[in-house]
Amino acid sequence: LVGYTLVTATLLVSAGRVSDMYGRVRLYNAGFAVFTAGSILCFFVQGQGNTAALELIVFRLVQGVGGAFLFANSAAILTDAFPPDQRGLAMGMNQIGMLAGTFGGLLLGGVLATIDWRAVFLVSVPFGLFGTVWAYLMLHETATIRAHQRLDLPGNVLFAVGLTLVLVGFTYAIQPYGNSSMGWGNPSVIGEIVGGLALLAVFIAAERRVPDPMFRLELFRIRMFAAGNIAGFLSSLARGGLQLVLIVWLQGIWLPLHGYAFEDAPLWAAVYMLPMTAGFLLAGPLSGALSDRYGARYFSTGGMLITAAAFVGFLTLPVDFDFAPFALLLLMLGIGMGAFASPNTASIMNAVPPEHRGASSGMRATFQNVASSLSLTLIFSLVVAGLSSSLPGALYGRLTAAGIPSGVASNISGVPPVGALFAAFLGYNPMATLIPGSVLAGLPSAARATVLSNSFFPQLLAGPFHDGLQVAFSVCVVLSLGAAAASWLRGRRYIHDYEVGQSAKVAQEPVVTHVGSGGASTTKRAEAAGIGRSPPTSTSGRLTPYCACPVSGQSPAPPPHSWVNMISSSPDRMTPTIASATDSAESALTDHESPPT
């Protein structure tokens, strides 16, 4: 479950940093190809048991590498391609595609799983192949490539190892250890978490001393960048594990209790989650477009307040709830998350200098992926804690009521809560193996049929699982309110005006290009497009930014067409334009490159 997320989270910042140096589109294209190759390899996993499981884990790691290349660059590419007054809408449309793909995959996976579990991985292949070809043919580099910078290899190693230890430690923390229902007392878990945090502390200290750091710590001096990432982290921590928990609730408990056969439960669980997707589809582009005009503060804050209200509503649901209020709360949850996501992402990307957008996008995605991984552990730890307190008594009472001897029932009631939870999720009743055959043979036929039925475990877990969910939803309310507070503290709308500096560099310096197969150099096409003209100046001779900083209540004007940073239109698909900086241009921009804190 965590291998893909683990690899993606550890590589996101590195992928973003590499894309700043060698090109975002190039790495984005590679992401499609690698992810598709990983999906094909997963489909061809052979056999059963440990060997097949190991192969599947390795190939999922390959998918994670491709996913990191994609996630690290999507927001940066959109920020480069769209003017500031359209970026919120662009982010909203992008996130709609991601969410629609996620739930579309759940639906298709539910159908294909009834045929062959390997076929689930085929869902990604046609989209991946199309994306690889389309991105290669249609996407062109619009960012300035800075290949002269060096990759921080020691920093990459420290970050990857430290984060891996932390995430692995938290993952194994939900496994039983000794007589405990969870592994928080396991010395290995404690050692992994402490060791990982220590390496991350060393990483942060080292990043302050290298000339080309992997993690641009100075970006946290920008208030909107810092507040936006804190809000995004808390938001992902609140909702990251929510989808899986809700699917477990539906697929493992609610649907079987309402007469659905287990083989149909995965498909119907995805169908019943659609109201959340609908809410996101409604709110995402709308809030993004409005935030382009009015700023992200009100929409991102309001979105998290709606999310918190939805979690409060989940607290009021009974164990055997009606679907109508459940669907309404899912819709609220989707609206809240959609209203928050695209304005928050756009405000983060608007706040940073263009030359750091790849690294900034990777940092933003890393915070969200790490929070989602930690959320999975947090939510399941809270649910398992609730199960631990009430499951043994419920299990003992149900077994003795069915005629199981007290001693046998007492032994069975010590089953690990995690095992019981996933047994219900997988549609497996372990009573046939836990209860001795001689005891089962001595039970009346009706009692034996009840104990061995597929509905026995869902009925047994419904109450204890609901107790754990109450604790988890309460924590999610607090985290959502924290994200709302961070969103509000981002301050007034701010868009970094460093694009003018980049335009000045392009205008004042010769353009270094490659010659395309058609024979015409990009330099001539750039001159024809207007590059080389001087940017507008104020009466004092200073450069006039096209986007004032901060902006309050007005839409920023898009940059003139003649100020593009890079032209890429040669027949051989991509010819990056590399502009060099001059001391005169840097000195002319001194007053424009320091964002308010």
Identify the meaning behind each predicted range.
Residues L1-L137, S287, V312-L315:
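Transmembrane-helix bundle of Major Facilitator Superfamily
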Residues V18-S19, L108-D116, F170, I174, ...:
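Interfacial helix-cap and linker-helix signal at transmembrane-aqueous boundaries
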Residues R26-A30, V34, A296-G302, A472:
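Juxtamembrane helix-start motifs in multi-pass secondary transporters
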Residues A205, M224, D292, M304, ...:
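Transmembrane-helix exit segments and adjacent C-terminal regions of multi-pass membrane proteins
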